[in-house]
Swiss-Prot record:
Pfam families: Hikeshi-like_C (PF21057), Hikeshi-like_N (PF05603). One of its GO terms (molecular function) is nuclear import signal receptor activity. GO terms for cellular component: cytosol; nucleus. It comes from Anopheles gambiae (African malaria mosquito). It comes from the Eukaryota. This is Protein OPI10 homolog. PANTHER family: HIKESHI FAMILY MEMBER, PROTEIN HIKESHI. GO terms for biological process: protein import into nucleus.
């Protein structure tokens, strides 16, 4: 199966150098993954999956201080030999931002940190993978619904905004700066883009 799998990252050469971890698990490293938004995982056509089996495609950002956190992206099979997966919403943006100061003063300059990602393919029963694969339609619907609610709320609150000089004393009213609502809106939208189901937790 080693030569049967490939990965394409936009603007880069095709990668087929999967490492075999076990009889049914294969792993490949994606260097400089910070700016990668989508990956294509495909069968090269040299060896098909056994009947009834498919390749579950998993994604992980390796962390030296924690065990791997694998996330199922979807699957490929003999009848669906390639798939495009969006990984940008899976990135640990907060951790990347927090680590950006670690490379200061190397050779007298600030150098960007290079992060790697890993993609694993696990040979599993196709029926099981079909049931586990997240529905992009549902995720997209949640995202659109959440975004509309947030936009509606922000527009509603903004319609009542006044400057401090326009305010009249109202001891029974509580005022919230519009900038605070804007910050909340920005954070909520970012979290919604990363994971449309984050609000369920």
């Amino acid at each position: 199966m080693l030569n049967a799998l490939g990965v394409i990252v936009s603007g880069r050469l095709v990668q087929t150098d999967f490492q075999q971890i076990s009889d049914s698990h294969f792993l490949i490293t994606i260097p400089d993954a910070d700016n990668v938004n989508h990956v294509v995982v495909f069968l090269t056509g040299t060896t098909p999956f056994p009947d009834g089996m498919a390749g579950g495609v998993y994604f992980s950002w390796p962390d030296p201080n924690a065990p791997p956190n694998w996330q199922l992206l979807g699957y490929i099979s003999n009848t669906k030999p390639s798939a495009i997966f969006k990984i940008s919403q899976l990135k640990k943006l907060d951790e990347i931002a927090g680590q950006s100061t670690m490379m200061n003063n190397v050779f007298g300059s600030n150098l960007p940190i290079s992060h790697i990602a890993q993609i694993g393919v696990s040979i599993e029963p196709e029926s099981s993978l079909v049931q586990q694969t997240p529905s992009t339609t549902t995720s997209s619907t949640y995202y659109q619904f959440g975004q509309k609610i947030v936009e509606n709320f922000f527009n509603f609150v903004s319609s009542f905004s006044i400057t401090q000089s326009q305010m009249t004393p109202a001891p029974n009213e509580t005022f919230v700066p519009l900038s605070t609502v804007q910050t909340w809106y920005t954070n909520f939208e970012r979290r919604l883009q990363q994971n449309p189901n984050f609000w369920k937790n």
